[in-house]
Swiss-Prot record:
Signal peptide annotation: none
Species the sequence originates in: Pseudomonas paraeruginosa (strain DSM 24068 / PA7)
Protein name: Thiopurine S-methyltransferase
Record-level GO cellular component terms: cytoplasm
Keywords: Cytoplasm, Methyltransferase, S-adenosyl-L-methionine, Transferase
Superkingdom of origin organism: Bacteria
Catalytic activity: S-adenosyl-L-methionine + a thiopurine = S-adenosyl-L-homocysteine + a thiopurine S-methylether
Length: 218
């Protein structure tokens, strides 16, 4: 899966993964990240999610990373924000209202960029990637996060043979494999969501579960 794939999806407005509301799991479980006002939370592969503005409204310092320049520009325009724009370490950096978005390759992100980060929130990053890239993504994320970080992870699972991703199925066993070393994993929620996901119903998927995990390092 190459960068051109995602650029084309955004250019053609093929963004069924984008939610027109703040993610309910985030609203229910943000407190589990134990973040204080002003502390930084990372949102990898963030798109133009409304979760960014909601997190900032909770008093947090929000750092998003997104490949698509269109997604980043759309986020600020749709939220009525005029960002300051500059270059930083190969990223195009947009800043406004407590939100910093780094437009560029997530795999170019380094530990120095996250020195002040306390937690991460992943709703649409891990499930956006095919298996080989998921392993690389999880490894890179863990390599650059500070010690004692916390994370909130949302996944989906379904019979992968019944539908081609993205979004891809990420079963519980895979989550635990990716984060086996040095992380405590707590499943916060799991439920059947097939009935409210028409895309999966249309494609004949026989079952669909969503799960939410709290990840604690150290």
């Amino acid at each position: 899966m190459q960068a051109d794939f995602w650029h084309a999806r955004w250019a053609n407005n093929q963004i069924g993964f984008h939610l027109d509301e703040v993610n309910p799991y985030l609203m229910r479980h943000l407190s589990r990240l134990r973040l204080q006002a002003g502390e930084q939370v990372l949102v990898p592969l963030c798109g133009k999610t409304l979760d960014l503005a909601w997190l900032a409204a909770q008093g947090l310092d929000v750092l998003g990373v997104e490949l698509s320049e269109k997604a980043v520009s759309d986020f600020f325009a749709e939220n009525g924000l005029q960002p300051a724009i500059d270059q930083m370490d190969g990223f195009r950096r947009y800043r406004a209202a407590g939100i910093t978005l780094l437009q560029g390759d997530f795999f170019a992100l380094q530990s120095g960029h996250l020195a002040g980060c306390r937690a991460f929130y992943d709703r649409a990053a891990l499930i956006a990637l095919p298996p080989d890239m998921r392993e690389r993504y999880a490894g890179h994320l863990q390599a650059i996060l500070p010690a004692r970080s916390l994370g909130l992870l949302v996944t989906i699972d379904y019979p992968q043979g019944e539908m081609a991703g993205p979004p891809f199925a990420v079963p519980d066993a895979e989550v635990r494999e990716h984060y086996a070393a040095g992380w405590r994993i707590e499943e916060l929620e799991r439920g059947d969501v097939l009935g409210v996901n028409w895309k999966f119903l249309e494609r004949g998927v026989s079952w669909l579960n969503e799960a939410v995990y709290l990840l604690q390092r150290g």
